[in-house]
Amino acid sequence: RSYPVREDGSFVWVWAGEPGAATLRRPPATHWLRDSNWATFGSSWETNAGLRLLQDNFADISHVAQVDAAIAPPVLSGTDLPPLDVSVTETSVAFSRQFAPAHVGSWQSQVMGLPEDGLFAQLEEGEFVAPGLWVDRWSVQADSERTFIFTHALTPISDRITGHTWSVSRNFALGAAAQGTLFPIFDAYYRRVKAILEGMQSMIDTDGYDEG
């Protein structure tokens, strides 16, 4: 069996539905991955865990402070997080959360060129764009907005194996020096997430999935 495909310069999209409907919906936009005003790095691998586990994980970053306190923005370690503003359409779910002015992490201040003792409003955004694409944004609102975009392309290989291509994009400090600082931090973090998800899948295989 063959499927309609479309290449957009970043991904190859496969339409698994009715072939005649493939032209009715364009693939989601990921223009920042190809935009010279953004710098992007990332990697890809197979995670021995089902697609649903990865989707659930990326839909809630409040656990980042527990997985890796060093990488987490300090505001995520608070006990009184602001509420999520959620919007739902027929094809996507998106949320945003605005944080009051607060400190940024030491690595953030380094690459963003911001004082560690400064207080900056911060905005978290996330969107389930398509079953195979999750996008997060984290913006620090200083003299100019400094934004990270985290793009997760997910390909189900089996019910227990998922291909994961992750990318981290930024609209500031576009040079190699910042990338040399950032890549080891995020590569180590996502490898840690991979190991945790694989451990969770192993537990599910043994004990079953608890919907509660």
How would you name each of these model-derived features?
Residues R1-W13:
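Active-site-proximal cofactor/substrate-binding loop regions of enzyme domains
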Residues S10, G17-G20:
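Short loop segments at secondary-structure junctions
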Residues W13-W15, W38:
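Tryptophan-centered motif/residue detector
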Residues G20, L24-G212:
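C-terminal catalytic domain of Rieske-type non-heme iron oxygenases
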